[in-house]
Amino acid sequence: MCGKAEERAMALLGKMGLASKAYNYPHELSGGQQQRVAIARALAMQPKGMLFDEATSALDPELIGEVLEVMRQLASEGMTMVIVTHEMEFAAQVADRVVVMDAGRIIEQGPPKVIFSNPAQERTRKFLRAVIERKVET
């Protein structure tokens, strides 16, 4: 890297809380750190929007918060994001719109407040109950 590219990379790693890891190899980083490096790499292209497909599903539970916090920060900065997630609490807090899918089809969509407090579809209600029960058990 040289000059502007290196400055940009370091700024993005700093934004991800990883400036001190800039010269580490991938195997020296945790799963959450690797995921944040991937986000920084994508941001280097200055996209208008980003797609996150289960960005936290392969992470240890204690690392999930790191990645969700970065995504929360991007949302607060106005980044357009399409997020596929089972992290319902996060979705309720961050989303402008929620789309519920079942078997590859959209079954319900709307503002988070409506979807999470008064879903129209029985399948959505069943899914949300299962997520809430799982959370209570842990």
Where are these regions (language model features)?
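Conserved ABC ATPase signature
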Residues: 25-29, 33
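Hydrophobic anchor residue at the start of the ABC signature
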Residues: 39
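H-loop/switch region of ABC-family ATPase nucleotide-binding domains
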Residues: 85-86
